[in-house]
UniProtKB/Swiss-Prot annotation:
Source organism of this protein record: Corynebacterium efficiens (strain DSM 44549 / YS-314 / AJ 12310 / JCM 11189 / NBRC 100395)
Record keywords: ATP synthesis, ATP-binding, Cell membrane, CF(1), Hydrogen ion transport, Ion transport, Membrane, Nucleotide-binding, Translocase, Transport
Similarity section: Belongs to the ATPase alpha/beta chains family.
GO molecular function, a single term: proton-transporting ATP synthase activity, rotational mechanism
Subcellular location: Cell membrane
The EC number(s) this enzyme carries: 7.1.2.2
Record keyword Membrane present: yes
SUPFAM superfamilies xrefs: C-terminal domain of alpha and beta subunits of F1 ATP synthase (SSF47917), N-terminal domain of alpha and beta subunits of F1 ATP synthase (SSF50615), P-loop containing nucleoside triphosphate hydrolases (SSF52540)
Annotated positions binding ATP: 167-174
Membrane topology according to the record: Peripheral membrane protein
GO CC annotation: plasma membrane; proton-transporting ATP synthase complex
Primary gene name: atpD
Designated name of the protein: ATP synthase subunit beta
PROSITE patterns membership: ATPASE_ALPHA_BETA
Amino acid sequence: MTTALTEQNAQQAATAGRVVRVIGAVVDVEFPRGELPALYNALTAEVTLESVAKTVVLEVAQHLGDNLIRTIAMAPTDGMVRGATVTDTGKPISVPVGDVVKGHVFNALGDCLDVPGLGRDGEQWGIHREPPSFDQLEGKTEILETGIKVIDLLTPYVKGGKIGLFGGAGVGKTVLIQEMITRIAREFSGTSVFAGVGERTREGTDLFLEMEEMGVLQDTALVFGQMDEPPGVRMRVALSGLTMAEYFRDVQNQDVLLFIDNIFRFTQAGSEVSTLLGRMPSAVGYQPTLADEMGVLQERITSTKGRSITSLQAVYVPADDYTDPAPATTFAHLDATTELDRSIASKGIYPAVNPLTSTSRILEPSIVGERHYEVSQRVIGILQKNKELQDIIAILGMDELSEEDKITVARARRLERFLGQNFFVAEKFTGLPGSYVPLADTIDAFERICNGDFDHYPEQAFNGLGGLDDVEAAYKKLTGK
């Protein structure tokens, strides 16, 4: 949204129209000739239902001709009637920005849910904004070191990149998200923004309470548009959260972590809105503008010179079909994918990241370095060989393997366990303190395991630990040496 356009819209503020048709979340409004509000402008209408008055926000979606516009309601339209007065605010939906949003919960319209009215008298930004221009973009690629071994070694994250997080219920997706928020706050003194898109209200409440308990809420802004809200809200809440993150990046020069849970619900809401607006559906019933809508969101998530927004996006895959247009369109924008696997979680290994199916575009020697790349490939090779041998082991048993294969399987089992790690947010469940393992220590540790330096250590010595110091301590405890 350009400055000139915003000023022009502001001049049209307080222009009044009237409702001519209401069909669920779609409201058609008539305005005086020459005074039509711009696309994406926010309109307000006063609605009374059962003697209770409320303000319903509408967003302009189409100009129909004959002074009519079609809008999408951002709240239930119960009680709205034909002839009701609608006022043009002269600007798009705007949300509070700056330090005032930290430690609080907002909805997609920028209203604070835990402290009503908070931030409305301060600076506000419209949620429809242009992505950074080409000359503002950061040219170099930099690793975001998380201190989580399996991620840093095998699926390194890009600072200012977009990471897809795949996982079903109960495999540790929410725990990994909370852990990343905690690490950004503790290790980098950074700010996190969490956008809950179309997920359960209970999950949002749990997240808020657990973050408050961990002491990281004061560094995090939360924006929710849950699954019981109209599709317009679910479609815009990701943009609201992103706008708050952009302020921290562009004005306060901070590195920001943006969580979107779930990016599929953003696509799903767009499909609902598209159908409501009468557009012809595309493949599998999705909106014809799917790629464009995804691009508008994703292109704003990037690194500019000296600061970045790194996004961790939970991705639901319908019926585990990765060719479905929704996840397929998302994949095109991702720099790394982290898949949480139920079979790994069932072994008690957390985070349950599958190292053989998770990927990162920066895992190459020119970016991470020759040694990092070589060690990662050795680890993946041993784990892959172990997977191939499982059928033979299941049928014939370990005794039928060659000595070389027996060594490979033994090292793979140690590697699998060592890829697990104790988390800060899980201390109350495990009784073990969380650990941050520097990347250099991670590379050294896995290289030594691959070399066979710890073949005489029992597998139990590698369970859910941090670095090699923890392994040594566990070995002494197990053996009494």
